[in-house]
Amino acid sequence: MKELTSSQIRQMYLDFFKSKGHTIEPSASLVPKDDPSLLWINSGVATMKKYFSGQVVPENPRLTSSQKSIRTNDIENVGKTARHHTLFEMLGNFSVGDYFKKEAIAWAWELLTSPDWFGWDPDKLYMTVYPKDTDAKDAWEAVGVAPDHIIAVEDNFWDIGEGPSGPDSEIFYDRGEAFNNLAADDPENYPGGENERYLEVWNIVFSQFNHEPDGTYKPLPRKNIDTGMGLERVVSIFQNAKTNFETDLFMPLIEKTAALSAGKHYGANAEDDISFKVIADHARAITFAIGDGALPGNEGRGYVIRRLIRRAIVNGQKLGIEGAFLDQLVPVVGQIMQAYYPEVLEQSDYIAKVVRSEEDRFGETLTDGLNLLNSLIADLKQQGGNQIAGADAFKLYDTYGFPVELTEEYADDQGITVDEAGFKAEMQKQKDRARNARGKQKAMGLQHDLLINVKTPSEYVGYTQLATTSKLTVLVAGDELVDHVTSGTAEAMFDVTPFYAEMGGQVADKGDILDEAGHVVAHVADVQHAPNGQNLHTLTVVAPMETGATYQLKVDTIFHSKVEKNHTATHLLDKALREVFGEHTQQAGSLVEGDYLRFDFTHFGQVDPADLAKAEALVNQKIFEELPVTTVETDIESAKKMGAIALFSEKYGKVVRVVSAGDFVTEFCGGNHVKNTNEIGLFKITSESGVGAGVRRIEAVTSAAAYAYLHDHDEILNAVGADLKVTQVDEIEQKVQALQAQVKALEQQQATLEGKLASQEAGAVFDHVTTAGNYQLISGTVQVSKMDQLRALADTWRDQALSDVLVLGAEVNGKANLIVAVSADKQKQVKAGDLIKAISPKINGGGGGRPNLAQAGGKNPAGLPDAMTAAADWLAEQK
């Protein structure tokens, strides 16, 4: 067996298929682009859907890739098995209507067994085939596979619902008897069974049927090949590792974690090993996901990241790691993967910052979960129950990241159990929902043959002219290719067009189609790219049109000019934000409309208004400097040497377009722009807000729209000035400050009066000392307007040393509040935190605190008297 690193194995696979005429597709972002059916890119073929569905025609029908992927449907198994991962790499080769079974099988065999490539022992390889797929069986035998190494398996048919489907062939590597975990006569002890000896390394799907909506299967007009080889599994074979984790993809992370732990070592303890594996796996997924623009949040991709971070932190605690540590693993991931993913190491400072921020928040999450758990326990006791329902335990786990083990421990302290069977049932329901969703989604789509074979060229000339004469070459109406239309909606292609097709955040051009006599025959409502890249115009037809005829195409120049100004301003804003906030700020999305622009960017925390003003001022400064705006088309490497900024989430062709505004900004862009920044006139930010964890959104206007916005605000200021009875706008701020000072003084007077009233009322309570067992107790309810006043009363009680224990309650804004204080000489016997936990269920709430002072909040103010009684009863039971 050759000794190869993971980087060498990945490159060898890609080089092999490159030698077979394949184009190497770069690994796409984990965040799917234009595919709402996927939360994450979860396989190599997921990035090829646009080719297999006919939405886009690839330049080369032979493709290969090493695609980073994320799956979280079996997250509970990560760390417990040899090969479950959240993040993994899928090596694959693909044929879009080109070669088929014979070539795919022959090349697979060559890669695996040739001494020039993997060089594996042929006797260690086994293949499974679909029983009816005699072509695949014959192809394997033709390359020299022994018949007893080819196994027919009924499940070898790839089908995920409507769309391409077909038989598949799986390849297994025999790791030897030393890896066998089953008895010789076990029915699963065979290649394809559930065992550790025969390791599946490759699956080749022969996509030859279309699964129709009516459940039938029809032969595809173009047969495809889709394969997937898990890099981590292959590396474990080359490096003779018992599991995927003992390879160079994971061990540096495990070793770093061990160094951060309380003297723990991988391999010394099975339970600790699970934690080491979980942390290593999750650190990889977290790093790559954040690097691709996803951020921790409460839903969707953000929730997945948050859940992985929480799970890793809990496992770090099991290893004795105190405080934040995951951020220290981010650069380790970058170093491991830098050969193929250099951007991860380049972004490691930013990624680590995001991770550290989320780690620091984890304590808040635990607190929220604890409050919910206290409420559940209080409700149970009130109803006479003694078991937390499985659904509630699952909610704590799934929504708050509350480990079920912690729920069980905490509930046990209160004499409550957890319905483990119910919890596991809810877990299974979640898995079933995920599995059903995968089965039902139309992941590959039906092949669209209407435009896929239309290769009539259509030249875009809109960079230099906004009107042209052109021939109508393709016409679609009613989902059919037609040669003429008279009215209604239609799609059209022209041999030349000045209309921009929506792309890169810029909306499509609008305008009219005129006949040779100058009469309008159609309005252009939208423009999108067809499968072969042509501009496809959506028309509202008002007069007859026919293919082959010549028409005048005229772009709405007023709308187009507004879009140009907003698009160039977007690039100026992007650069200005990086100047003000730092290079960690990245574009997270944009929309360039005619009447406004929208720009999303990564930034943690609130945006300081002063910094936002700096960015706005910088954009306007560059507008007033009258910078020339130039564009150039060049190859991607030359563009990068020019310093052009590219988005990691975008894919670029061999030739790219670069836009520059003086020396201030140079970025990849295929959109329309002004010739000089002075054409923008004015730039004004109209709003800034958060749209997700770590993502901020700016909306802005330019030119006449910016003037109109400022004019409207002037009118508002004038109206406010009139209400405040000031004659000059610049006097408004001074007047408002004076009013605020007056309000603050009144509030202070009110607080002083309320404090005096509370003290008077508390005086009556403080005068009434009772005996509860061995302790002197003062308890009762008072009227206050906020919790701070309760704490102030506790301070008064402590200063006067009025009793051993104080318990006060109050209703504030419809909620119940409790405070418990214990004198210094009694804190060894009685702790305020213990007492508050005992009585807070009476108000349907929970709380905690220090031995000398604790507080709680709840939803049931009517329970405050019961809480006072419970406090006395609890104290009476203490020694």
From Swiss-Prot:
Pfam families for the chain: DHHA1 (PF02272), tRNA-synt_2c (PF01411), tRNA_SAD (PF07973)
Claim: Ligase is one of the keywords in the record: yes
EC top class, as a word: ligase
The enzyme's E.C. designation: 6.1.1.7
UniProt-recorded Gene Ontology molecular function terms: alanine-tRNA ligase activity; aminoacyl-tRNA deacylase activity; ATP binding; catalytic activity, acting on a protein; transferase activity; tRNA binding; zinc ion binding
Free-text cofactor note: Binds 1 zinc ion per subunit.
Cellular localization per UniProt: Cytoplasm
CDD domains referenced in this protein's UniProt entry, alphabetically: AlaRS_core
Keywords: Aminoacyl-tRNA synthetase, ATP-binding, Cytoplasm, Ligase, Metal-binding, Nucleotide-binding, Protein biosynthesis, RNA-binding, tRNA-binding, Zinc
Keyword Cytoplasm found: yes
Gene Ontology, cellular component aspect: cytosol
InterPro entries: aa-tRNA-synth_II/BPL/LPL (IPR045864), Ala-tRNA-lgiase_IIc (IPR002318), Ala-tRNA-ligase_IIc_anticod-bd (IPR018162), Ala-tRNA-synth_IIc_core (IPR018165), Ala-tRNA-synth_IIc_N (IPR018164), Ala-tRNA_ligase (IPR050058), Ala_tRNA_ligase_euk/bac (IPR023033), DHHA1_dom (IPR003156)
Listed cofactors: Zn(2+)
Positions with a binding annotation for Zn(2+): H567, H571, C669, H673
SMART domains: tRNA_SAD (SM00863)
UniProt note: domains: Consists of three domains; the N-terminal catalytic domain, the editing domain and the C-terminal C-Ala domain. The editing domain removes incorrectly charged amino acids, while the C-Ala domain, along with tRNA(Ala), serves as a bridge to cooperatively bring together the editing and aminoacylation centers thus stimulating deacylation of misacylated tRNAs.
PANTHER family: ALANINE--TRNA LIGASE, CYTOPLASMIC (PTHR11777:SF9), ALANYL-TRNA SYNTHETASE (PTHR11777)
Family, as annotated: Belongs to the class-II aminoacyl-tRNA synthetase family.
Protein name: Alanine--tRNA ligase
Origin species: Levilactobacillus brevis (strain ATCC 367 / BCRC 12310 / CIP 105137 / JCM 1170 / LMG 11437 / NCIMB 947 / NCTC 947) (Lactobacillus brevis)
